[in-house]
Amino acid sequence: MKKALMIFAATFVAIAVAMPALAAVEFQYGGVFRTRWITSNNLNDGSSDVQDNNNMFDQRLRLYLTFKASENLKVVWKAEIGNVTWGSFKGGRMGADDVNVKTKNAYVQFNIPNTPTTAIIGIQGISLLNSWLVDDDFSAAAFVTKIDNFTITLAYIAGQNYPDSTGNETESYYSSTKDNVDDYAFAVTYDQKGMPIKGTLTGVFMNANMVPWAIYPEVMQSPVTSQAYPAGQTTTAALPGVFIGSTNYYSTAANPSTSIAGISWMGNKLDGVKNNQMFDLGFNLTYKIDWLSAYVNFAKNIGSVKTASRQVIGLKGTSTGTEAVYGSVIGGVPLIDVGQVQDLDYTGWMIDAGVNYFCGPYTFNMGGFYTSGQKTKDQRVYLYDSNGNITGSYVTQRYQSTDNVDFFTYPGTTSKYFSEIVGGGILDAAGPFASAAAGNNGSNFWRGYGFPSNLWTVTAGAAWQVLEKTKLSASYWYFQTSESVGTGRFNTDLSEKMSNDIGHEFNLYLTQGIVDGLTLDIVGAFLLTGDAYARNGYIGVTTAGTPYIVQWSKDNVYEVGARLQWDF
């Protein structure tokens, strides 16, 4: 921290010395400082059987520097120091020195002469459709045109430009686009002064080439490369980026290293990705008068991706004796059928609506949203004995359909906040079992904070402005999955218990102004968990192929904390 402050001090001195020569340049500054205390229990696993109590302090400082030549030209730099967790080895322990200054934004903004268009070029924040499409910092070029009551935005977002020289393809990796992700966006807003209605039509075209972006939501946090394996390539190894053996969004195993061949329990293996293109089209309508406001957001996934899906055609064991497990069968009998290359259509959709009523010091709100989920199917598979002979029995296995990409997905990174526990809220340092990181094998086939998918909710809340600087607010949320998800697998025949119930969440906030814009928020949240919040057991398999049952009891979740913040 001391090194960072010295850097900033030197920068300010240099600017001060240069100011006489730069008299035409106006210097502006601002920023946000926050520090938080967070404690929670059962947030990560929905159970008290394993210790997952979290108690921590963290802090973050963002500085906004603007160099303004005129109303027609300015350069903006936004830096971030943090997040720093108190007591950590990365700048939070005694001494506190660390290299933790990051660039959030760095762009030039200028008006194009003789046109009504403003250009913004560089690393910038872009939010579309109230965070339902994208909401993050991007390397991008945006052009905003204002004509009468219309505002038209066109943008190019460089999601990923990753040359790959390690693949099997012969062309020069310098010109290869197979690992590129490009987004092209537009937004047309109609807003007439004096009218209570405002509307926006938004579209984003994603061209992800051979990158599994949007198919697996966790990839959008940290895109991966195609590794040069086109759709239809056959291999038995789990290849980075290809997700042929998904142990991420579709997996329910607790430890991927103990699963055989990396086969997920309710998902099918994919043999690479090709021609991954999606178009999202959505709209927002808002209505606002003195005592009432209302809104609705809608978005639809359109497009397709070419891939190959592998089906489980055989299991090892018997339905009444030895546990049915995945694994190699003596004699070379294949348990996995290499699927044919096919086009999967993006069919997901979402809708979000709400209303707020203002009555003096009181505000009342209600609303909710729905995001589609991945449909599931039952398939009948053979059972083989240890010698590779069919036992004559079948079992029914539930798995996630790969006929289409049915769950609502996103063309770029976003950060959608809503409730405190499932939706990130103010204390977003940790997310729930199913959402903290989609790579978590307990993801249970739904997502909350960050990229809501296979999730719907209804909510109601109220706020009371007790004093000028004191506000109390509370909200209730009921969550379910749109498509049922697995809650546990214990039976020999691999049947899956299913549920939609995530739970009832209650949030309570006290907001207190302290001095000169410094604000303290005190937060309390409690979730009565349903069966779908997290799995309560599964059949594990050792590397030697020996099955074992893992089971834990379900418990409720709480989160308590505070945030001290100054916007300046």
Q: Where are the regions a protein language model picked out?
A:
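Beta-barrel outer-membrane channel/assembly domains of diderm bacteria
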Residues: K3-I123, V134-D135, A141-L154, N168, ...
